């Protein structure tokens, strides 16, 4: 199972690809999509769309997972982030991928063991759980953490379904 993790943002959208087989995780790739900050909002959203489409085309994931965003004190920033998140949810869904959504606290809990972990702790645990991973940025590490969270929750859901079917 190849999973695309996405950490949405209008300035930087982190992405990470992992392979999850049974209980084993393997880092495939990661990076950041950086729309041109000087471009109009609509153009930045197009650049975000095109960047995610390129990642999907290059790595052929089976499923996607997106981190839910928190509401910020600045309504204008929250609205723009929501628009970017809409693109981040739409692209994999339009590509036929099932999309899971996870709260940041659940992602941190799944990867670090506490929902209040710092970004540095998340990055360190991602590198521990994915040997050989050198996550390019904190945004990429966060996206990989979202993918890891999805793999863990997906595996649990499959085990429950098998147990109920017996």
From Swiss-Prot:
What species was this sequence derived from? Paramagnetospirillum magneticum (strain ATCC 700264 / AMB-1) (Magnetospirillum magneticum)
Q: Which GO terms describe its molecular function?
A: crossover junction DNA endonuclease activity; DNA binding; magnesium ion binding
Pfam families linked: RuvC (PF02075)
Q: Its GO CC terms?
A: cytoplasm; Holliday junction resolvase complex
E.C. code = 3.1.21.10
Instruction: Give the matching PROSITE patterns.
Output: RUVC (PS01321)
Catalysed reaction, written as an equation: Endonucleolytic cleavage at a junction such as a reciprocal single-stranded crossover between two homologous DNA duplexes (Holliday junction)
What InterPro entries would the database entry show? Answer: RNaseH-like_sf, RNaseH_sf, X-over_junc_endoDNase_Mg_BS, X-over_junc_endoDNase_RuvC
Q: Where in the cell is it found?
A: Cytoplasm
Which leading EC class covers this enzyme?
hydrolase
Binding, Mg(2+) 1: 7, 139
Name of this protein: Crossover junction endodeoxyribonuclease RuvC
The cofactor(s) it depends on are: Mg(2+)
